Amino acid sequence: IYANAEKYPIIYAKYAEEGNFPKIEDSFYNYRKNISFNNASLMYYPPYSQYIRNYLYNETYALGHSPMRNQYSSKFTVDLLNTIQSKIDIESSKNAFLRQTVISHFYNKSSCDINEEAFSTFLKLSTNEKDKKLIQNLVDDSKAIRINNNLPNFNVTNYNNSKHSISKIIKDRNAFLFFWSPEFVSESYIVSRINFLSNNYPNIQFIPVKIDGDKNNRIQKLDIKNQFYLDNDSDAYKFLTSKMPRSILINKKGKVINGFASISSYNLNNYLKQLNETK
């Protein structure tokens, strides 16, 4: 109930005709007086952690940000990271919220045009060295592939154990390369999502490329001819140091139109529509 109460202003603004937050009396939040925001024993209990997350977003919006529907501004992300820093005392929980925030906002944006200030703020606030290394790798990966440039060539391996040049596979085609690891995304989700996207954007070749995990196991419910994996010596690892999921969109001329898209983001649709209509 309290999690929904914290989210109420955001939901209201999303569906209100004028798109503004509702006017709320201070007494509406009196229940906060009875809630501990730093209960270590509850922090990994989903209803509690969801409440804390909604509270942090609500507090950040209260700093004067306008409602945001499709993506968060860099300023909002920075303010949210600082809100987490000031409100959460448990170090492990603070680091977890910081990590989840910077990653989810980056993937939601679905673009290689990164928010430098947000990432810099995360690296300053987090005390988890493993997380900081992951995020730094993510930043470096995003900068390694730039829009309007040719995709660097690299080899992929099919499930007959034959190596192929990616440039030959996608030559004269609009392509969506999805680099994935079972550590971060399930096969069932990939099947559902790629089937959906393939039906809606028939002029794009969707190619999942496995970058980690058991390379012998392909995705059973997708066409084997469009599935590949990376051998350990593939040059693709130069822009996949984080090992996190990454989508790259390339047009028929071999030019990158999005170097770091998210397969799950709503903001991906405009890029796919543009690519699907490319002659």
What are these regions (language model features)?
Residues 107-110, 182-186, 213, 263-264:
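Short acidic, S/G/P-rich loop/turn micro-motifs used as interaction or catalytic elements
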Residues 252-279:
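Thiol-/selenol-based redox modules, centered on thioredoxin-like
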Residues 219-253:
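Short, internal strand/loop/helix patches
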Residues 164-194:
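Short active-site neighborhood of thiol/selenol oxidoreductases, capturing the structured segment around
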Residues 159, 178, 201, 244-245, ...:
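Exposed, low-structure sequence patches enriched in small/polar residues
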Residues 171-174, 202-205, 224-225, 252:
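Loop/turn elements at helix/coil->beta-strand transitions in domains of secreted/extracellular proteins
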Residues 183-223, 232-235:
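Structural microenvironment flanking redox-active thiols in thiol-disulfide oxidoreductases
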